[in-house]
């Protein structure tokens, strides 16, 4: 009897080719698109390359018809609201910079989809993610599109039921396969933005969710001297230079957000660099738990190339990451992910420098 696999189909080329490859490998493939957005107007206007708009559903359905596999749209709105939107808003209200895609991967695209898939008798779920899976995840062959940073907090149970069939292919090869078999999404652009804020106006979105406007306050320098007025903490993130509206003879950047005093601390570039950061909410992938210092490569944001560091386990279960060279703008709320030999060792949330 064929093993059954549910493929999360975003309407993009990666998940479409993943479904094709799994069918070729002999699996009983079912395509599913996750309907996650509550606001129908935003759902309709979601950008062409997005993963949750009407165009995504239409594209995924056309691919499923071309591959001759069953296809369904499943409602995950409640889970998306709880685990992604509410988290996103809460973090910004705390003057932190969240990773909504990481939360979506763990709690919606994996936990919720896997639960629903096992209920209908599936053995696995599969995605178009580009890493390669105690279970671990290896860097993709496509460094520019590697998604392991956003997958660090998957559980062992989730990984044991996960297939990632395109992990050994680079993006040009994936598009080539799609063209060769006549998939209608072969040249479709990759999605880049947060899908539920297509206009990038985070402050208006958060105001709509909370019913509260962000409060103006003071820009201050590192000594506490007032430099001007800011528009509200949610408009700023660590390392930001543009849009400050402050005149200065030298470039200035956001150094710190202080929700307790509603202040934005500004600094010169050199003050953004530091060697250490504390990381909490650790998910261990290649180890049960660290008990002694280890060497690793640390990534402190999605676009970060990674840098050598030493991880020091702390008595409270957190990690102190000490980088060999100072790193720029380590930002509370962002994920820090650590690698050994191209495999994800562990990761967590940056709490402070």
Please report, for each region that a protein language model flagged, where it lies by residue.
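ATP-dependent adenylation/nucleotidyltransferase module used to activate substrates
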Residues: 1-152, 163, 172, 179
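AMP-forming adenylation/ATP pyrophosphatase catalytic core
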Residues: 126-132, 136-353
């Amino acid at each position: 009897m064929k093993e059954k696999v549910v493929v999360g189909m975003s309407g993009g080329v990666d998940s479409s080719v993943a479904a094709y490859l799994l069918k070729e490998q002999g699996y009983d493939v079912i395509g599913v698109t996750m309907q996650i957005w509550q606001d129908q107007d935003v759902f309709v206007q979601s950008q062409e390359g997005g993963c949750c708009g009407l165009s995504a559903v239409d594209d995924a359905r056309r691919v499923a018809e071309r591959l001759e596999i069953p296809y369904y749209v499943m409602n995950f709105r409640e889970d998306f609201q709880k685990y992604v939107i509410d988290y996103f808003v809460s973090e910004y209200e705390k003057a932190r910079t969240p990773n909504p895609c990481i939360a979506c991967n763990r709690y919606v695209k994996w936990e919720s989809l896997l639960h629903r898939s096992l209920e209908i008798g599936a053995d696995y779920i599969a995605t178009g993610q580009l890493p390669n899976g105690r279970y671990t995840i290896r860097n993709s062959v496509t460094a520019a599109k590697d998604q392991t940073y956003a997958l660090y907090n998957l559980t062992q149970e989730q990984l044991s039921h996960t297939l990632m069939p395109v992990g050994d292919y680079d993006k040009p090869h994936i598009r080539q396969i799609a063209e060769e078999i006549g998939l209608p999404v072969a040249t479709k652009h990759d999605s880049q933005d947060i899908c539920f804020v297509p206009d990038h106006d985070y402050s208006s979105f958060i105001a709509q969710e909370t019913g509260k406007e962000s409060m103006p306050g003071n820009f201050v320098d590192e000594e506490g001297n007032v430099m001007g007025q800011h528009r509200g903490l949610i408009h700023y993130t660590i390392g930001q230079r543009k849009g400050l509206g402050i005149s200065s003879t030298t470039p200035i950047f956001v150094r710190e957000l202080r929700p307790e005093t509603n202040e934005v601390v500004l600094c010169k570039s050199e003050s953004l660099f530091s060697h250490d950061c504390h990381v909490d909410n650790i998910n261990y992938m290649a180890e049960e738990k660290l008990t002694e210092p280890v060497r690793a490569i640390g990534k402190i944001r999605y676009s970060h190339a990674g840098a050598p560091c030493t991880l020091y386990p702390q008595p409270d279960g957190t990690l102190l990451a000490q980088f060999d060279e100072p790193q720029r703008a380590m930002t509370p709320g962002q994920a820090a992910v650590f690698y050994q030999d191209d495999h994800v060792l562990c990761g967590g949330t940056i709490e402070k420098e």
